Regions:
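N-terminal secretory signal peptides
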Residues: 1-14, 21-24, 35-36
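Solvent-exposed, polar/charged alpha-helical surfaces in well-ordered, non-transmembrane soluble domains
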Residues: 68-71, 95, 217, 308-315
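Exported/periplasmic cell-wall-interacting domains
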Residues: 203-205, 229, 238-246, 251, ...
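Boundary regions of SH3-family modules and the immediately adjacent low-complexity/disordered segments
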Residues: 35-40, 95-129, 175-205
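SH3/SH3-like beta-barrel superfamily modules
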Residues: 70-109, 152-188
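Solvent-exposed coil/turn segments that connect beta secondary-structure elements
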Residues: 81, 100-102, 177-179, 190, ...
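Cell wall/extracellular polymer interaction/catalysis modules
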Residues: 162-243
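SH3-family beta-barrel domains
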Residues: 20-26, 32-59, 69-72, 110-145, ...
Length: 339
């Protein structure tokens, strides 16, 4: 797995060759070279969450004996990663669990980390990230507690206050930025994100720009003509969903509830992390928790990437966003070229 390389020593051809040949890993994680390793080094994953109901097999091949299936949101131990079936070509990675072999495309890499609750929330709220496989939220009204969304690992949310429930559990109140409702979730399931964690990367970088290659399903970030970062992506499933052309990062949000009620195009995704919009139609670069199927068209038009990669892009691109701000616009943001 290639995590960090010294880009200053690489030509563009070398960089792309390395990126394409990166040894396989659960996330095919491609990360920036040098600089800021404490904040950018990817976490180590040894558990996963099944995004859908998934079959597992005797061998890392769908042609081998089927042993059973996991229902949606099963959390499984990952004992080994291996190249299995050559198809699908974009992702031949299989995961060994205690029960059998599972294809990785719809297994979200997760951790299970509990956190010390913050009892006093700053005025205006606090950005926080889910650090458990998922956390059940609740909507409280005059009829009692109603089950709300599941907040999934690596999703981000705005915490507005803390309170202690009647049983002693400490809860965060989360403001939903789509419908305006307030949901509550166990506080120890979310990790506060501090200012140091999202400080701008290379703020003095010269002529920053991003290339989104639809054919190769890869994003490359440049400073002038020097590649500084690359990651696999998943763009629009249908031709034209992710439009070709030249754009700029014009709006940024660290968290966004994305949803559509269009027939045949329904989705409802709270807490989408590290969103960089490049068009007022809603096309954006952002982190993803509802699949792990990078390297092939997959989305409704947005440019999906791992949460870790999206966070790096969010920090590197202009406009820069203060940690206590939930929305920034700019007419001179980082250039994005979709080819």
């Amino acid at each position: 797995m290639i995590n960090f390389v010294m880009a200053s020593r690489l030509t563009r051809r070398d960089f792309l060759k390395l990126a394409g040949a990166a040894a396989v890993g659960f996330g095919f994680r491609d990360f920036p070279p040098g600089g800021d390793p404490a904040n950018n080094r990817p976490p180590s994953f040894n558990i996963g969450r099944t995004v859908y109901s998934l079959r597992y097999y005797e061998q890392p091949s769908s042609s081998s004996k089927e042993l059973g299936f996991y229902v949606t949101d099963t959390v499984v131990d990952i004992l080994e990663e291996r190249v299995g079936d050559p198809e699908p070509e974009h992702n031949p990675i299989w995961l060994r669990t205690p029960d059998g072999w599972l294809h990785s495309s719809y297994v979200q890499p997760v951790q299970n980390q509990l956190n010390e609750p913050v009892m006093k929330i700053p005025a205006g709220g606090m950005l926080a990230e889910v650090t458990v496989p998922y956390s059940q939220s609740w909507l409280i009204n005059d009829r009692g507690w109603k089950r709300g969304y599941k907040y999934y690992y690596a999703s981000t949310h705005w915490v507005m206050r803390t309170f202690v429930g009647s049983t002693g559990i400490i809860w965060y109140s989360i403001l939903d930025d789509r419908g305006g409702e307030t949901y509550v979730v166990e506080a120890e399931h979310l990790r506060p994100i501090g200012a140091a964690e999202i400080t701008p990367i290379s703020p003095d970088g010269v002529n920053k720009w991003i290339q989104v290659d639809l054919g190769k399903q890869r994003l490359i970030a440049f400073e002038a003509n020097r590649p500084v970062f690359t990651t696999r992506i998943a763009t629009g499933y249908f031709e034209g969903d992710t439009p070709l052309g030249e754009y700029r990062v014009e709006r940024k949000q660290p968290s966004r509830h994305m949803a559509s009620d269009s027939i045949g195009n329904e989705f409802d995704l709270p807490g989408v992390p590290w969103v960089c919009y490049i068009a007022w139609t809603g096309v954006s670069l952002h982190g993803t928790y509802w699949h792990h199927n990078y390297g092939t068209p997959q989305s409704h038009g947005c440019i999906n990437m791992t949460p870790e990669a999206a966070k790096w892009i969010y920090r590197w691109t202009e406009p820069f966003v203060p940690v206590d701000d939930d929305y920034v616009e700019s007419e001179t943001g980082t250039r994005v070229v979709v080819i």
